[in-house]
């Protein structure tokens, strides 16, 4: 099995509309759906929800 099959690189985009993104990996076996995480958006200086971008 290749390295990127189970844990692909994904982008997390801010829902605040600032365009800020985080880049991370996710385990497809444990999280098959799009993930959402609350992270810090430095553009608006607040914690907001980031959603997986495809």
UniProtKB/Swiss-Prot annotation:
Tell me the InterPro entries matching this sequence. Ribosomal_bL33, Ribosomal_bL33_CS, Ribosomal_bL33_sf, Ribosomal_zn-bd
Family annotation (Pfam families):
Ribosomal_L33 (PF00471)
Q: Name one GO biological process term.
A: translation
Named from the GO MF annotations, one term is: structural constituent of ribosome
Gene Ontology, cellular component aspect: cytosolic large ribosomal subunit
UniProtKB keywords: Ribonucleoprotein, Ribosomal protein
Indicate the family of this protein. Belongs to the bacterial ribosomal protein bL33 family.
Q: What is this protein called?
A: Large ribosomal subunit protein bL33
């Amino acid at each position: 099995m290749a390295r990127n099959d189970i844990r692909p690189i994904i982008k997390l985009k801010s829902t605040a509309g600032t365009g800020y993104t985080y880049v991370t990996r996710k385990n497809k076996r444990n999280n098959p759906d799009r993930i959402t995480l609350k992270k810090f958006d430095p553009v608006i200086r607040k914690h907001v929800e980031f959603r997986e971008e495809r």
